[in-house]
């Protein structure tokens, strides 16, 4: 679908809840170079991808996916066997989480035309989302207000994952990889931000205060 169709569907199906407002913050150069290199190498070589026949209930496009952590799994089985969780800890350890709900990797294959996927929410209840990008391509993530967050290597998007958003597939590279985290909590840990001389916020829409420990 095009952007106007996307915004129309979001307005009709996902009206804004004053008690659960959308927000987004984008950080570039989020990981240190050696951490990003380790993660990128793992995702591009030995990572055990699976396939899903559809993106969500309303979008039948197939894509590659792998759950790495799921709180709904049985006790002591939340982390998926056969996946090395260590490369992902570099991301999760820098986020002010109270509890993680899900951690998964997505891969969208090349599309012949630019097309926005059907909008969705990750969970029905209020929670936070973090989306980490590994590739430079023409496949943005679209927020509920229609703003497209471009896919750039080592970029982190923090957003309200219980409000409408959508992915898209690239036309200028073979695939687009992202790491999607759903959690209860707040923003980037303050001690990590202090390690960065000038943390680069490239896009921001926050109609309230989001803290490290999850307060608003």
PLM regions: where:
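A short beta-strand-loop-beta hairpin characteristic of the jelly-roll/cupin
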Residues: 114-118, 125, 133-152, 193
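A short hydrophobic beta-strand segment most commonly corresponding to one strand
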Residues: 130-132, 173-189
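Short beta-strand His + acidic residue motifs that chelate non-heme Fe in jelly-roll/DSBH
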Residues: 118-119, 164-172
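A short coil-to-beta-strand element that immediately follows conserved catalytic motifs
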Residues: 96-106
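Conserved metal-binding segment of the jelly-roll/cupin
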Residues: 149-165
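Non-heme Fe(II)/2-oxoglutarate
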Residues: 2-98, 111, 199-216
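Short, charged interaction patches at domain edges and termini
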Residues: 182-208
């Amino acid at each position: 679908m095009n952007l106007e169709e996307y915004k129309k569907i979001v307005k009709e199906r996902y009206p804004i809840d004053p008690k659960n407002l959308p927000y987004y913050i984008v950080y570039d150069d989020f990981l240190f170079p050696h951490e990003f290199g380790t993660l990128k190498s793992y995702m591009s070589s030995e990572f055990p991808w699976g396939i899903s026949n559809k993106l969500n209930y309303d979008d039948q496009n197939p894509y590659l996916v792998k759950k790495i952590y799921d709180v709904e799994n049985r006790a002591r089985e939340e982390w998926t066997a056969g996946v090395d969780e260590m490369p992902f800890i570099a991301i999760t350890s820098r986020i002010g989480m109270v509890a993680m709900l899900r951690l998964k990797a997505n891969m969208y294959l090349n599309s012949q035309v630019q097309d926005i996927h059907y909008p969705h929410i990750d969970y029905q209840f209020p929670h936070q989302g973090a989306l980490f990008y590994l590739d430079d391509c023409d496949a943005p993530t679209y927020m509920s207000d229609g703003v497209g967050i471009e896919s750039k290597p080592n970029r982190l998007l923090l957003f309200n994952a219980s409000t409408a958003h959508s992915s898209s597939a690239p036309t200028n590279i073979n695939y687009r990889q992202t790491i999607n985290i759903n959690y209860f909590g707040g923003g980037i840990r303050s001690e990590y931000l202090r390690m960065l001389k000038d943390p680069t916020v490239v896009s921001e829409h926050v109609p309230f205060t989001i803290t490290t420990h999850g307060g608003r």
